[in-house]
Amino acid sequence: MSTGHKSLSPSDFVNDENQSVGSSSSSFVPVEQNSENAIQMINENKQFNESILNYIEKSTSSSDIGNNYHIISVFGSQSTGKSTLLNHLFNTNFDVMDESKRQQTTKGIWMAHSPLVSSTLTNGSKSEENIFVMDVEGTDGRERGEDQDFERKAALFALSTSEILIINIWETQVGLYQGANMGLLKTVFEVNLSLFGKSKLDKNDHKVLLLFVIRDHIGVTPLENLAATLTQDLVAMWDSLNIPPELSHLQFQDFFDIAFHTLGHKVLQPEKFTDDIKLLGNKIIDMHDSGYLFKKNYHHNIPVDGWTMYAESCWNQIDNNKDLDLPTQQILVAKFKCDEILNLVYDEFVLGFNEHLLADAPSKSSDTETSIDYSELGLSFMQMRNATLENFELAASKYNQSVYEQKRAALSLKINNKFSELFEIYVKDLVDKYTKSFTDTVSFGKKKLQGNTFHEGITNLQESIFQEFSQNIALISLNGDLEYDNHVKGLQLKLEQMVSKQQIVELNSIITKSLKKLNNGLGKVIVEELNDPKSDTWDNILEKFKSYVDSTVSKYEVGAGEYDFGLGTSLQSNIGAINKFKYKSWVSFHELIHKYISKDNVLNSLKDRFDDKFRYDENGLPRLYQNGHELDNSFNESKSYAMDILPVLTIAKLSDGTEILPDYDIFDKRLRNQYGGASVVTADDQQISIDTDSEDEEEENPCFAEILSESDKAAILAKFKKEINAKFVETKRSIIQNVTQIPYYIYLVILVLGWNEFMAIIRNPLFFTLALLLGAGAYVMYHLNLLKPASIVAQRMIDESIVLAKQKLKEFLLDEPETHGHNLNKISGNKTPPEDESIELDNLDPK
């Protein structure tokens, strides 16, 4: 143990430094020619060197580096190559071990400035920031034996003053407790927490990076697996610390970050060792590298001269702390062995758990309807947990009793946590099953519900499901060790939400069906009334509309202002549903009016009404006007008759002159948001903001009774007048054509010029009769529009006659000479005509 702290002057370290350089000259060869000598920061007698600041100022090119620096320390077992690692990586000149001897080389704590960091960037690059590295005396050395006081304090000092603590271990040490210095780290973490943890409350973003450099990595075990093992060990170790109450909320991740890097074997794989060193150098100097190590919250945020004072103060506090003694070795052994046994039996438990229980757990791909005996399943849970705890008790109960009980409780908690994963799977499966069963039953409505009403049936179904679910889930809860009340409440809440949604669906269905019935009936009434508009048309339509609404509302009214749909919904919801029905009834009324009354429909109605009066008389026979005076009177009368229905079709006004006013302002945006959606109004819907109409404040409010605007009416009248004026002009033109006569002098001209021809026809009865027939036929065909078809038939007859004439001429020219020649041959005794004559006759055949 230390006998006390003593700071040395620079002259006190001269002999030590000379001895170090002398001792290292025979065993150390610089990695690079530009490597820099180191200075002993704390000697083996725990004395702090006050000349550190002078060394820093001399070793840097800038006189004032301020915060532009980084501190890196290395920590690890003795003779594991810590100094060699620093020399190769940072081009420092730390003393290294003679490979022919296994003995302590580094004594105390040494510091050196890194002039160059080895990397793949042009075979090494100078960092933009100054890097100082501290080489800490190795742990577990035979020179100090069981005196571990200095190595613990040195490790604690390095952890408290550095941004990055390099933990140098061999691959074969991963997973070991002492070999990986886990025991020492645990003590250092605990003391560091007690000494410096309170500053974390004021500066909660500061962390230290623990960089594990795994040496002699041959690649059989992936880095990911090694990292997982070390991370798990560190987190577990932190959770077991004696943390002060005021810091109990802080976790390992609040103090430390972890990084990992592997190096090949220096002797057997020299090239890979060098390459791995350079890759690590990239992470230190290349800020664009994905594994860049330095972060802002690692720095202590004090100038370098302040850091030297801070480091000296830390060492004073660490060296003079009387409470730094570690627990007894018996406690350490008990903790280590109990942890080892705990991990062993827990691994066996997990193996059996995965093989026998987890494999049989329900999954998405499995049949969710498979029957499960939850009583038997819960018994198997208990048997497996008890067997695991008995195995731990058998092997670990011989160690320290308090440690054993603590670890047994931890094991029981881990087992329960593992079972909770499976428990959640079965709970989710149960929830899915009962939810599906509930949904299937509810979807059929009253058909499958046991009750007189929907509300009574749904209540009975909920109670049945809650009781069965609670019984099954309690059987697999490890006698209540696994909390399940929240799951029961969750299912209850879920079913209540489903019931609420189904109530809304049923309520909306009632409203929708009622509105559909109203639309069908009211639509027919509107069509019938508009076929023959009268002054009381809108009185009849409004009366029918109100009768439809009142008959629907009265079906569900149970009292003055109270309604019941038999769904178990609240009074507020029922009133909201009735209000919604009434509101949407007026909306449907408005839509039906505009559906059957449009600009085109009104125009057609006016034209039809005008035609009925203008073209037909009281008996329905077509009118034949004899003179213009009669036409003018009929036109004015028909026009007035048609215009009488225009006010009825353009505004919904009762016979007493009042306009139809709806019970709800269907154009109010707030009411549209409240009643116009798909869902039924609930109590929450009353909280809709009244600011929703702010956008329409400047717009003119539309009128329910106004069917067509004044501009629409003007357009209809313009088209109507244009069309009836055209009909008037057409009718008047026909009257003028009928009264128009041929001038008499025309007949005189015809008589004088055609007298001879006329008399020739008159004197010849044949010509006279033929002329009469032809004239009568032409007259008939003209009136029947048959002149063109007749001309086509005549043309075809002429064409056929020409073809027939050609054929007869051909027969005459070819057949008659051949017949005469044949007869002459018989007379002369020749049976066949001469060849030349036959050929000549053949030549007459047309080609």
UniProtKB/Swiss-Prot annotation:
Primary location class: endoplasmic reticulum
Topology relative to the membrane: Multi-pass membrane protein
GO molecular function, one term: GTPase activity
Positions of the GB1/RHD3-type G domain: 66-297
EC number annotated for this UniProt entry: 3.6.5.-
Keyword entries, A-Z: Endoplasmic reticulum, GTP-binding, Hydrolase, Membrane, Nucleotide-binding, Transmembrane, Transmembrane helix
Alphabetical list of CDD domains matching this protein: GBP (cd01851)
Residue spans, topological domain Cytoplasmic: 1-741, 787-847
Membrane-spanning segments: 742-762, 766-786
Residues covered by region (Disordered): 1-31, 820-847
GO CC terms in record: cortical endoplasmic reticulum; endoplasmic reticulum membrane
Subcellular location: Endoplasmic reticulum membrane
One record GO biological process: endoplasmic reticulum inheritance
Stretches with biased composition (Acidic residues): 835-847
Alphabetized InterPro entries for the sequence: G_GB1_RHD3_dom (IPR030386), P-loop_NTPase (IPR027417), RHD3/Sey1 (IPR008803), Sey1/RHD3-like_3HB (IPR046758)
UniProt keyword annotation of Endoplasmic reticulum present: yes
Entry annotated with the keyword Nucleotide-binding: yes
Lumenal topological segments: 763-765
Compositional bias ranges of the Polar residues kind: 1-22
Annotated residues for binding of GTP: 76-83
Function as written in the Swiss-Prot or TrEMBL entry: Cooperates with the reticulon proteins and tubule-shaping DP1 family proteins to generate and maintain the structure of the tubular endoplasmic reticulum network. Has GTPase activity, which is required for its function in ER organization.
Similarity comment text for this entry: Belongs to the TRAFAC class dynamin-like GTPase superfamily. GB1/RHD3 GTPase family. RHD3 subfamily.
Record HAMAP family: Sey1
UniProt name for this protein: Protein SEY1
Gene source species: Debaryomyces hansenii (strain ATCC 36239 / CBS 767 / BCRC 21394 / JCM 1990 / NBRC 0083 / IGC 2968) (Yeast)
Lineage: Eukaryota, Fungi, Dikarya, Ascomycota, Saccharomycotina
Gene: SEY1
